[in-house]
Amino acid sequence: MKKLFIIANWMQGKALSGGDRIFIELSKRWSQKLDISIFISKEGADICSRDGQNPANKIIWASDIFSGHYTVDGVYRTIIGIFKALSIRAYQGDIILSSSDFLPDAIPAFILKFKNPKVKWIASFYLFAPKPWQKKSPYKGTKYLLGLVYWLSQLPVYYIIKQFADIVFVTSQPDIKLFITKHRGIEKIIPVRGGVDVLPARQYFEQEEFIPFENRSYDACFVGRFHYQKGILELIHIWKNVCKIRPHSRIAIIGIGPLEKKVHNLIIHMNLQANIDLLGFLNGADKYEVFKKSKIIVHPATYDSGGMATAEAMAWGLPGVAFDLEALKSYYPKGMLKTECFNLGAFANNILYLLSDLNAHLTLSQEALALVKEQWNWEQQAQSILHQIT
């Protein structure tokens, strides 16, 4: 049995990123065909246990001592990862998967590849950092320095992965061409859109006890990290516009992250306490209960490479509303209303349209269900990717 070493040393907090979800779900489904070891942070180990990924070989590298301090924590975890990688023995035929493009994951994987060029390095590179001075960057004003550090730290990683990785996981079709080299053809750059566990939703619909549209508690829901890229602050402004037309509209917000305090303060400032329920981090059955009670899924990301959480909600028949980002064109060709980028008023109008036009809602709902069935099934994704990497 081939060995797979997964490096997930950058996992932080309690929230689950799209990249984290990808390696957890894939490794669950590969565990019978590969001998898997995971080198992970303390927080990452807790997240994996919570999500049912408990391989026999789960080795904790970084502690959470500097968690929340982005730059210091990145340096600490990278140094820990380097020393740990120097002590690992990997042999010809072994597979190394770096779960993100962040330095604490990518650099240790590169060291293992450098020590033994015969191992196969699969590098995950799911999102190019925006140039902080560009118009589309979410890192403006006081966020500029954070965006600059993020962008600068990714430059050496991109070079190393492009030059030395055997296979690259990306999420967006437009990113494929950026990793083609003389030694790596297009077949070695694999778009990994992620997936959805469709079974719970299928069982729910088969029972024929689903909640009618007019009886659902929430007009919309949001799932995602409280991060500038996810548009969580923009969402509060959008919901204010919705409530100007429909004063009693309610939205469920699922997630946690570094912007929690700003989100709380903005809700109070806009007097939306009665219209917005902050539910924190939810997973599994608790999250599904919110989907059952919601009418729409909103994805107001301002910079993104996909958006897997939206597909989860679509599996429960929720049509989506999002900005018309380039990456979403291939991810969500149907089942979603696309809005002119960063026009908050137009975004609110699309929400209001789906809430008032039941025929339009039904059409998009059926499209969403079909899209998930066709393109987002985890079992199909996992088997297809395994075939390509082994």
Regions flagged by a language model, labelled:
Residues 264-282:
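Nucleotide-activated donor-binding/catalytic signature segment of Leloir-type glycosyltransferases, i.e.
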Residues 336-345, 353-358:
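Conserved acidic donor-binding segment of nucleotide-sugar-dependent glycosyltransferases
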Residues 302:
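Aromatic "clamp/platform" in nucleotide-sugar-dependent glycosyltransferases that forms part
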Residues 174, 195:
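Carbohydrate-associated surface elements
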Residues 1-51:
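N-terminal subdomain of nucleotide-sugar transferases
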Residues 319-322:
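Short hydrophobic beta-strand element within catalytic cores of glycosyltransferases
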Residues 111-114, 129, 144-168:
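Membrane-proximal helix-turn-helix segments that form the acceptor-binding/catalytic region
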Residues 212-230, 236-239:
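Conserved donor-binding/catalytic core segment of Leloir-type glycosyltransferases
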